[in-house]
Amino acid sequence: VAIGSRYNDDGGIDAGHVRVYEWDGTTWNQKGQDIDGEGPGDQFSFSLDISGDGSILVVGAFTNDGNGANSGHARVYEFDGTTWNQLGSDLDGEAADDQNGWSVAINNSGDRVAVGARANDGSASNAGHVRVYDWDGTTWNQVGADIDGEAENDYSGWALSMSSNGNRIAIGAPLNDGNGGSSGHVRVYEWDGTNWNQLGLDIDGEAIGDQSGAFLDLSKDGTRVAIGGYLNDGGGVDAGHGRVYE
C-alpha cells in the first residue's frame, strides 16, 4: 500500500512525501525510503497510483513549479528491491497554473500512465486536459493527442481512472454544465493504437450543482465505471450519491 502525506515537510515546507508498505502476514513494513517531493509547496502525493504488482508508482505534485508556477508534475518510481528510483524525467505541466498531477493513474504493468491537469487552458480557460504516456525503457512518450475538456471552467482531469491494460480511461469534469451549472460529467475513452476515441455519450450529473465526476473509478476490464456526485441532493441537501454504469 502506498500512502501520501502531501503536507510533509522533510523535503521542505509542504513538499510532501510517499511511503510504501508491505504486509508480511502480521505487520505492515515500510519498503524502501520515503519518497520526498522536490521542493517546498509541491504537495507531492496529492495524487498517486500503483501498478498491479506494487513495484511501480506514479505520484502527482500539482503545485510544483518546474514549468512555471503551479504548472505541476508527475513522477514515476520503480522499486529495485531496496530503493525507489525515478523512471525517466518529470512529466511536467504544459504551462503555469495547469495544476498537472492533480490526478494520476497507472496500468497494471506499470508502463502506461495518465496525468490530469485540471486547469489547463488548451481548449479554453480552465477546461483541463489529460495526457497519457508510455514507457519505452528509457523515456516517457506521449500516446495520442491531449484529451481536452469540453468547455471553459470544466476542470476536466479532476479525476481519472485507467483499465488494467491501459486502453480505456475515465475522466471526470465536475464543473461541466452539460445538465445545468456544475452538474458535472464523465467521459470514457478507448485507445485504438493511434487516437483516444470517446466511448458512448457523456455521463452527465443528475442536476445543477451535483459536481458529478469529482470522484470515479473504472473497473479493471474497463466495462464498468462508478461515479460520485458528492453534492447531489437525492438524499438531502448535499447528501451525495454514487451511480454505476456499464
Predicted regions and their residues:
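Conserved beta-strand/short-helix segments
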Residues: 1-246
